[in-house]
Amino acid sequence: MALSNTATPIYYGQFRDAVLRGDILVNQEISMEMNRIDGLIANPGVWYDDEAINGFISFCENELTLTDGEDLHLLDTFKLWAEQIFGWYYFVEQSVYEPEPDGHGGHYVTKYIKKRLINKQFLIIARGAAKSMYGSCIQNYFLNVDTSTTHQITTAPTMKQAEEIMSPIKTAITRSRGPLFKFLTEGSIQNTTGSKANRVKLASTKKGIENFLTGSLLEVRPMNIDKLQGLRCKVATVDEWLSGDIREDVIGAIEQGASKNPDYLIVAMSSEGTVRNGSGDTIKMELADILKGKYVNPHVSIWWYKLDSIDEVSQPDKWIKANPNLGKTVSYETYQLDVDRAEKAPANRNDILAKRFGIPMEGYTYYFTYEETLPHRKRDFWQMPCALGADLSQGDDFCAFTFLFPLSNGSFGVKTRNYISSLTLK
């Protein structure tokens, strides 16, 4: 298929048909993103090209491996997300100076430059959806297929966490499964004085992963603005940007430097977090405005998976809204165990709701269940065994004595005696 401004993308078309048939359940945010994609299809100024996405799929399935060395077979969701990046293009009219053939003088001509539409992709999806593997595929593709010299970075709240993007690439280099990687890894990295033909062309070094044919580099950077601003990177992946207590807008810092390149790409992947009022919440508010149409930005792709309501946690058939790869990269049994754990161990409830179902909750723990906070009638406890606890503080300030009376039904009666000194009272 050549460029078309009317064609429906292949993998999005298959996904949309499955949604309309009721085979795939989607939440409100994904539904709004589908409306945005339908708007791109109807826009005559935006063009779809299937060659790039099919080339990406062919490269991944012929050359790449999983972290453990098994052959990689792209999930349907990977194809859907990658199609948004590689499938859409638009043309920009530019006036370019062309010298005359004899070298004397010249003139300006108008040219149409083809540019990739999507510069940023946000992927908010539950834990266990292989999102880091997706980011690794994107980085690997640009590192080894893009013939220009690219500087690529990956960042995460910790440096070791960012290695999750690098690890599958290192495994693919070691395995050298396909013809391209066999060629790139042929030779020895120690051969620095002999023929360049006998040197390895792709290797993991102390800098990162280097492609010596093009001079391209993929490296890990710490997730703070000081280490990320001013970079002229062409491709950047940001992992778990909602999970940590991140108070800086690192995605904005990366974009300011990356925008020096005409076709930069930033892929930000994360599961929902439990830390509120950080930069991640501000970004999510912006994404919500884009999805609702309050703020038009066709250069951003948003795949925001979550349950529509906390009531759906008890409905296993709705869990696919939060993790479309459920049953492929993570089992239903794992989810069921976490649901049971959230019911039996309330301290873990917020984290499970956020990480497994995309429901933003504040805080990490709470001590009392709802039932334990309900008021009880006043009771007296006399001539019963008890346990005594005392908080003597500084002795001259505040003292508290608490008596716990074990009851026959497994609960405890509580009595407290609290005292302050006359000095504190004054």
Briefly describe each language-model feature range.
Residues 2-390:
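Phosphate/NTP-binding elements of NTP-utilizing enzymes
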Residues 170, 212, 405-426:
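Nucleic-acid-processing active sites and adjacent nucleic-acid-binding tracks
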Residues 229-231, 246-247, 399-400, 412-415:
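Extended hydrophobic-aromatic, low-complexity segments
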Residues 382-407:
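Gly/Thr-rich phosphate-binding beta-strand-loop-beta motif of the actin/hexokinase/Hsp70
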